[in-house]
């Protein structure tokens, strides 16, 4: 059981010149046990800050975060994090990187069991046969997949994922999206997922939180039943309506903010449709 509660959470960063920058303002939300919740919004709106606070890496200036009614005071074995960029120990092989993570959370496994668990999750993310390679021998996308495999192998109750698929090619992104849905179906883990990709959020999530100006602007409960079919979802009028509404939130935000940082087109599939002509877009194709 892993229910998450954010109660009136605010957070500030202080730079080297001791200037204070607000990152979150009075954020409240409840994520139920077993829910997949995506957080979307323009760059700088506070998405990653929420994840770092949920992970216990930062403490809120005010308010509190509760997991199963207990106040979060730091990191914990009930949570694991996938960062935007891979976080592997360069002096360890890929297998040893996974085993290191597994041993932090699962005790009393034999050497053979540890190796089998590492190999199982590497195969799940399409990296069979790289166990004895070092991170420097893999591409950036492969390293990120290895980091995702390590997080999944740790088997925590809560997965916190900060744009985990951004550096991964379109084919493997689809593979990993479906893997996450399989894990959700089989284990009922609670997943909090930060993404810039509206289509990805709609395909994966039970709810989508749209952030704006350091707050949660919209909490959108999705009506799509599980298991989901990409083809059926893309053909759904309800899907198209919700997608249009979410994209309009981005453009409403853009018209009010001059310093918006747009998602770079090159970071997504070239098959992704632009919303209108040459305007920047935020969504990618699902396949």
Predicted regions and their residues:
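Hydrophobic anchor residue at the start of the ABC signature
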Residues: 82, 148
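Helix-to-loop junction immediately C-terminal to a conserved catalytic motif
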Residues: 55
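Conserved ABC transporter NBD signature motif
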Residues: 63-74
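Conserved ABC ATPase "signature" region
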Residues: 110-130, 182
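The feature captures the beta-strand-to-loop junction immediately N-terminal to the Walker
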Residues: 40-42
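Short helical segment in ABC ATPase nucleotide-binding domains corresponding to the A-loop/adjacent helical element
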Residues: 95-103, 112-115
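Conserved ABC ATPase signature
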Residues: 134-138, 142
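A short, proline-enriched helix->beta-strand linker immediately N-terminal to the Walker B motif
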Residues: 153-157
